[in-house]
């Protein structure tokens, strides 16, 4: 009913009577007014940012920031950062985003003061610091809803001048969220006066996320003692910190004689992620330094002495060198064709988070148009909430590369020719070791013993073979994501 009323009032298009509802004592009318003004894209929504009800203020913030945005009202939304009474995270994230988008000195001051306020939750203070760090060149995508906002370039000198004097206070903070955000801001703004403090925090802080952030910042800031910091990072107990340290190898002026001493321990006892990072680094290094190490790794790969989770990374690193000599040595490591054997290097070693991102957002794969997770998504194909308990990694790969090879019960048509000559077509409801159960035009499902079947034909799946759409790296990431979708 409310939707019908909102739609009708927005089509009538009279703004003044709707704005007048800002003074109404009826909460429902004020909420409806926000919804109508959102449809009308009216900057008068800024009036509702002064409402006494934080829910209504938050709805007004959503209306102003999200979708196409109401840009004239963004300064008013940003100004809410000075109000200490608000606690709603959706509201304050939009206020932070509005300040970043408006981009004036006033908004920058609001962000800095908000980040300093200890009464604010650490994740929101960290978000404010992150916005400050990207002030000179924000992402083209909205920090809240991901919509494309276009390229913005500002003078970094202004933000560096304003934030630099507060850096010592942020680095003294005990909260990991603040320290990580501060390190990233220092790095992106190229503030170089605090390298010694970053190094000290990197050595001593209990949080691996903080140690990783400090080490990464030191690498970006060309720290003079980066080799020492890298060695400390490589000896860290946390895999993530060690992986960051591996990425710093390219910043060292290493001779080819010293390189094996760094690489070999990683492939002897390091994690898959560390090995993948090392291979990425080797692919970027001058060939005269990395050649001998790559030759050794290729041999290990051909001798089955490397984890399958790094074979794709090895082939990519070798191809990045553009050395025909090395590429020719890959042999069977570089699989070709369109069968499953050509994709075996995608079975392990994927990035689960990247797979999640691909599944939910990639416009080429369009996974969520057909498959649901947690009740959200399409119903053309089966829900995948428990797919990791149902299919092996090999079966997941087959489902991506050759989706018609195996039908999911309830989602595919099968035609079988029986040994007595009868032909039956129906939807596959269940398949066991002994029989097929098909839903046909008959009232009851038909149970057909496999021993009676002379020929079976699965109808082509509506899902295209994803090997023609996805890169091998994307396939590997999606397999890692799907293999971990398991219900207890």
Predicted regions and their residues:
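The canonical Cys-X-X-Cys-His
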Residues: 355-358, 362-374, 384, 463, ...
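Residue-level detector of extended alpha-helical repeat arrays and alpha-solenoid scaffolds
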Residues: 2, 30, 57-58, 88-92, ...
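Structured surface patches comprising rigid loops and adjacent beta-strands/short helices at the edges
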Residues: 443-462
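C-terminal capping alpha-helices of c-type cytochrome domains
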Residues: 314-321, 401, 422-424, 428-434, ...
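Short inter-helical turns and helix N-cap capping residues of alpha-solenoid HEAT/ARM repeat scaffolds
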Residues: 25-27, 52-55, 84-88, 119-121, ...
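Core register positions within helices of long alpha-helical scaffolds
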Residues: 4-11, 35-39, 63-66, 94-101, ...
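Amphipathic alpha-helical scaffolding segments comprising HEAT/armadillo-like alpha-solenoid repeats
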Residues: 1, 11-23, 40-50, 69-83, ...
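Electrostatic cytochrome c docking/interface patches
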Residues: 334-362, 392-395, 419-421
